[in-house]
């Protein structure tokens, strides 16, 4: 992959999720951060490890699509 991909989902002007995709130890890793309303501490499920970058990208795309269906803006 050779770099990192960061995407953020917002709703009503507030960040609700952030996904970071990068290479590490011969795999592609996706870290997720979910920011709950009223909480100072984000949830950090994962990390999610994939043997190929296309699999990791697909995971990120599907997660972002689900967030869009829920009314979030993705950037």
Locations of regions flagged by a protein language model:
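Short, hydrophobic/aromatic-rich segments at coil-to-beta transitions
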Residues: 1-7
């Amino acid at each position: 992959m050779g770099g990192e991909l960061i995407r953020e989902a917002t709703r009503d002007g507030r960040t609700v999720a952030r996904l970071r995709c990068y290479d590490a130890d011969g795999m592609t890793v996706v870290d997720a951060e979910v920011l709950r309303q009223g909480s100072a501490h984000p949830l950090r499920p994962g990390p999610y490890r994939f043997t190929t970058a296309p699999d990791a990208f697909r995971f990120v795309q599907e997660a972002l699509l689900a967030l869009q269906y829920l009314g979030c803006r993705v950037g």
